[in-house]
């Protein structure tokens, strides 16, 4: 009886080790930074210094005609990559100038700003 039980356990173990790796989706850079409190803190500080203080206001309070970045009604850019492009390149014929990679840590800082905005954004349908 014990030999049968041990054989079944070994067989089950071998079947479980079929060599196939489980498929897990890689996190995006925004998802990675959203899970990192230090990255979110840096994103918030950069947002307050570069975005909120100039045009967009702090967490939902817009200034002048700039977009509220914490709601779901974005006129320009829906995906993280589109938002990245808008911030780096700007929007022609608007007050939104392109920042390029002019952050102290380059593109990583911009991704941290995007992660912060996404983290604080109200849930979208």
Describe each PLM feature range.
Residues 2-8:
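Sec-dependent signal peptide recognition
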Residues 13-16:
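C-terminal motif of bacterial Sec signal peptides marking the signal peptidase cleavage site
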Residues 18, 52, 56, 123-125:
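Sequence contexts marking disulfide-bonded cysteines in secreted/extracellular proteins
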Residues 19-46:
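Electrostatic cytochrome c docking/interface patches
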Residues 33-34, 57-88:
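Gly/Gly-Pro-rich "capping" loops immediately C-terminal to redox-active cysteine motifs
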Residues 38, 42, 46, 78-82, ...:
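Extracytoplasmic/secreted proteins, especially bacterial periplasmic and envelope-associated proteins
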Residues 43, 47-58, 113-117:
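The canonical Cys-X-X-Cys-His
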Residues 63-69, 88-121, 125:
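Axial heme c-ligation environment in periplasmic c-type cytochrome domains
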């Amino acid at each position: 009886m014990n030999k049968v039980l041990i054989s079944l356990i070994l067989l089950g173990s071998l079947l479980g080790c079929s060599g196939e790796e489980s498929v897990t989706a890689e996190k995006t850079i925004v998802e990675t930074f959203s899970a990192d409190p230090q990255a979110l803190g840096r994103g918030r500080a950069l947002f307050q210094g570069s975005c909120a203080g100039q045009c967009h206001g702090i967490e939902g309070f817009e200034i002048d005609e700039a977009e509220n970045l914490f709601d779901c009604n974005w006129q320009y850019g829906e995906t993280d990559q589109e938002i990245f492009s808008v911030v780096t390149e700007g929007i022609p014929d608007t007050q939104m100038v392109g920042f390029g990679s002019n952050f102290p840590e380059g593109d990583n800082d911009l991704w941290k700003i995007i992660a912060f905005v996404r983290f604080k954004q109200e849930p979208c349908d």
